[in-house]
From Swiss-Prot:
GO molecular function terms noted in the UniProt entry: ATP binding; ATP hydrolysis activity
CDD domains per record: ABC_FeS_Assembly
Protein name, UniProt field: Vegetative protein 296
Gene3D superfamilies noted in UniProt: P-loop containing nucleotide triphosphate hydrolases
ABC transporter domain location: 6-248
NCBIfam families documented for this protein: sufC (TIGR01978)
Superkingdom of origin: Bacteria
Length: 261
């Protein structure tokens, strides 16, 4: 299987008529881990929502392609079937659907008819991954995210990632609200996914996550655009010095785009 490439060119996105993204350019290839950092309200979460096709976010200009195919022409489920995955900051609770049923359906939705994962293979894979993420085996039969703690929801998102094995994953503030032990476990799961067939875009406020998952590229977003990119050392400098030096370097006075995004 050839490595995939997610290409974002000159992406402009509006929400309720207000422009949030103002020309984002990014390329993520299989085998690469990218981090997007930036102050609050600079469009980081808007980027993840636009990639996955959230109906509230209107793309007014630019393109998103996965291996040359137009992602913007795809429905949300088609984006997932094509190999995109979003781990959300606040995952939804779905009553009446067990974790195991949800995961098996999600895996089979990406497969051809007649090529569904066998029940035995699925159970073995799920047991192995839940043990790796130090999850209670009973969580397999609980309703999806219902009554889960914040940490359990985040582990569950990473369990989905490990079970579904997408081509490109977008992790939107997967580290928010996690204590250090949960962060280590979640990071361990993400690092286990590293391969030339898997690319990852991590959206985060904090260097803390990047202490456990070393990014190949760090991007800084301000004013709805990527204003600076560098290696892992860029995140370390941001942790030590904040964002003011970038604002001064680029002559930016107000880094937000007018709302929490």
């Amino acid at each position: 299987m050839a490595a995939s490439t997610l290409t974002i060119k000159d992406l402009h996105v509006e929400i309720e008529g207000k422009e949030i993204l103002k020309g984002v350019n990014l390329e993520i290839k299989g085998g690469e881990f990218h981090a997007v950092m930036g102050p609050n309200g600079t469009g980081k979460s808007t980027l993840s929502a636009a990639i996955m096709g959230h109906p509230k976010y209107e793309v007014t200009k630019g393109s998103i392609t996965l291996d040359g195919k137009d992602v913007l022409e795809m429905e949300v489920d088609e984006r997932a079937q094509a190999g995109l995955f979003l781990a959300m900051q606040y995952p939804s609770e779905i009553s009446g659907v067990t974790n195991a049923d949800f995961l098996r359906s999600a895996i089979n939705a990406r497969r051809e008819e007649g090529d569904e994962i066998s029940l035995m293979k699925f159970i073995r894979k799920m047991d192995e991954n839940m043990e790796f993420l130090e999850m209670d085996p009973e969580m397999a039969q609980r309703y999806l995210n219902e009554g889960f703690s914040g940490g359990e929801k985040k582990r569950n998102e990473i369990l989905q990632l490990m079970m579904i094995e997408p081509k490109i994953a977008i992790l939107d503030e997967i580290d928010s609200g996690l204590d250090i032990d949960a962060l280590k476990v979640v990071s361990k799961g993400i690092n286990k996914m590293r391969s030339e067939n898997f690319g990852c875009l991590m959206i985060t406020h904090y260097q803390r996550l990047l202490n456990y998952i070393t990014p190949d590229v760090v991007h800084v977003m301000m004013q709805g655009r990527v204003v600076k990119s560098g290696g892992a050392e860029l995140a370390q400098r941001l942790e030590a010095e904040g964002y003011d030096w970038i604002k001064q370097e680029l002559g930016i006075e107000d880094e937000t785009v007018g709302q929490e995004a």
